[in-house]
């Protein structure tokens, strides 16, 4: 079977205009996939040079396949049909290692056509490393490497204002563009680089904050033989992802034209502020997950897909989203409903087996950040507690018993909560405390909730009533009136 390379698989090759820090599955099935579509359908005409930012020889370099690889995008389409779409990606030209090819790395700054920098160096990547020096070849941190590359660009083109870059980080931290810019400026000052360079950084370059959203499932180890048989070639860099994707970029409106989004619309939004989109994702996507997990798991289900195929549990989740979460969010309702519809479709994706127990990790913190704001906003707006979000809190407390149908299951959270719940449920079993007292103790934990939730009118009583129903009737019976 042939292996991918440009000799045996000839096709378009594009001039290098994009530098990408990070060779991982996510960027390849997200950014490079989108660039490939834009190259095909518009005159974007931009090739990617991948820079491996860490010192490792595994996985091998994309250059072993001349930058070629296949994405397999699969899930439910807009009509709810299961689809699987294989695409040979030609947007990546080559990969270089910043550790073994440092001179080649610096040379990227000399190319007048270079315009964009994308990155995904993990959440820990946009961070300060105290020991980094200008003369390191290379520096350890990504921001320090980028500072050195930007200075090379500035020096080579004598500070020309038309040679700046649009820098678009994809790391999962809040306002990632602002965070990266601050660190680049910090290194520039610590290294005593010229004031003219610092001015050029500000005037000629854009650091754009982003919100990225796509589940990338990566190399399909269990199915690779079957998939390669269908493709007719061997691919060491096969990359699988869900059908849905969203790229929100906080940047200048001109970016839409530069990326040719005006000629071939992708699900990319150029916005003034990513904050409402971040809140939408946390509240609807993450919030629905967090409400779903303890209810569905204690109803005897194991995956998100099973839960969405269960009529009652699915109705519970959808009513929570449409009746209790969306009404208190600050974006146009039609936008929110469209996003919610995409979310429930993603939850039903038959190609992804998302285990409920793996999403249950750190459930107490997830409830505080993802659901509590909407629960309190609903109570404030209507004077009554949102029934399903409140029930989800009762289900969460019940989940920490660690037992389903007489069998134990692992509960993962910080040690404080695991010990606390062990003690509380033990006291409850021994009838030392009643349900309402147990709930009150949990809700009074100011250090966790950042407030005393026992002061929210009716919350202790309603959660205790729901919890009693779960304990006495079982989850199925208890949740049914809310479905």
UniProtKB/Swiss-Prot annotation:
Record key words, sorted: NAD, Oxidoreductase
Transmembrane spans: none
Keyword Oxidoreductase (UniProt): yes
UniProt lineage: Bacteria, Pseudomonadati, Pseudomonadota, Gammaproteobacteria, Enterobacterales
Organism the protein comes from: Shigella flexneri
Pathway it works in: Carbohydrate metabolism; pentose and glucuronate interconversion
Protein name per UniProt: Altronate oxidoreductase
Similarity comment: Belongs to the mannitol dehydrogenase family. UxaB subfamily.
UniProt catalytic activity: D-altronate + NAD(+) = keto-D-tagaturonate + NADH + H(+)
A cellular component annotation (GO) from this entry: cytosol
Entries under InterPro entries matching the protein: 6-PGluconate_DH-like_C_sf, 6PGD_dom2, Altronate_OxRdtase, Mannitol_DH_C, Mannitol_DH_N, NAD(P)-bd_dom_sf
GO molecular function, one term: mannitol-1-phosphate 5-dehydrogenase activity
EC number assigned by the record: 1.1.1.58
Biological process according to GO: D-galacturonate catabolic process; mannitol catabolic process
Residues bound to NAD(+): 18-29
Ranges in coiled-coil conformation: none
């Amino acid at each position: 079977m042939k292996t991918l390379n440009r000799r045996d698989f000839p096709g378009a090759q594009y001039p290098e205009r994009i530098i990408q820090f990070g060779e991982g599955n996510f960027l390849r099935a997200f950014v490079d996939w989108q660039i490939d579509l834009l190259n095909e359908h518009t005159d974007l005409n931009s090739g990617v040079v991948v820079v491996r930012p860490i010192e490792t020889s595994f996985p091998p370099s994309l250059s072993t396949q001349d930058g070629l690889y296949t994405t397999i995008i699969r899930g439910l389409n807009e009509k709810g049909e299961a689809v699987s779409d294989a695409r040979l990606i030609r947007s990546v030209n080559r990969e270089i290692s910043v550790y073994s090819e440092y001179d080649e790395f610096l040379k990227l700054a000399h190319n007048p056509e270079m315009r964009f920098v994308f990155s995904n160096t993990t959440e820990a990547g946009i961070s300060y490393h105290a020991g980094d020096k200008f003369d390191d070849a290379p520096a350890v941190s990504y921001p320090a490497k980028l500072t050195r590359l930007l200075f090379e660009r500035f020096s080579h083109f004598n500070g020309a204002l038309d040679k700046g870059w649009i820098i678009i980080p994809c790391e999962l931290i809040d306002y990632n563009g602002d965070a990266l810019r601050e660190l680049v400026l910090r290194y520039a000052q610590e290294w005593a680089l010229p004031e003219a360079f610092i001015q050029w950084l500000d005037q000629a370059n854009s650091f754009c904050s982003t919100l990225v959203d796509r589940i990338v499932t990566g190399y399909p180890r269990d199915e690779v033989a079957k998939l390669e048989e269908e493709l007719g070639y061997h691919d060491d860099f096969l990359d699988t992802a869900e059908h849905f994707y969203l790229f929100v970029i906080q940047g200048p409106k001109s970016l839409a034209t530069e990326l040719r989004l005006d000629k071939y619309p992708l699900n990319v939004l150029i916005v003034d502020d990513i904050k409402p989109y971040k809140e939408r994702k946390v509240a609807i996507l993450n919030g629905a997950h967090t409400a779903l997990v303890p209810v569905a798991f204690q109803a005897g289900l194991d995956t998100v897909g099973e839960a969405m195929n269960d009529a009652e549990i699915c109705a519970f989740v959808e009513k929570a989203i449409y009746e209790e979460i969306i009404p208190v969010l600050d974006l146009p309702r039609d936008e929110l409903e469209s996003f919610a519809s995409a979310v429930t479709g993603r939850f039903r994706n038959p190609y992804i087996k998302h285990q409920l127990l793996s999403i249950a990790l750190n459930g107490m913190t997830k409830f505080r950040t993802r659901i509590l704001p909407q629960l309190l906003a609903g109570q404030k707006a209507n004077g009554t507690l949102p029934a399903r979000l409140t029930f989800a809190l009762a289900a969460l407390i019940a989940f920490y018993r660690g037992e389903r149908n007489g069998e134990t299951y692992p509960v993962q959270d910080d040690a404080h909560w695991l010990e606390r719940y062990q003690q509380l449920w033990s006291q409850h079993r021994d009838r030392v405390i009643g349900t309402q007292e147990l709930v009150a103790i949990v809700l009074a934990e100011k250090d966790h909730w950042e407030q005393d939730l026992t002061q929210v009118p009716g919350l202790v009583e309603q959660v205790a009533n729901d919890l009693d129903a779960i304990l006495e009737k079982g989850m199925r019976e208890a949740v049914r009136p809310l479905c």
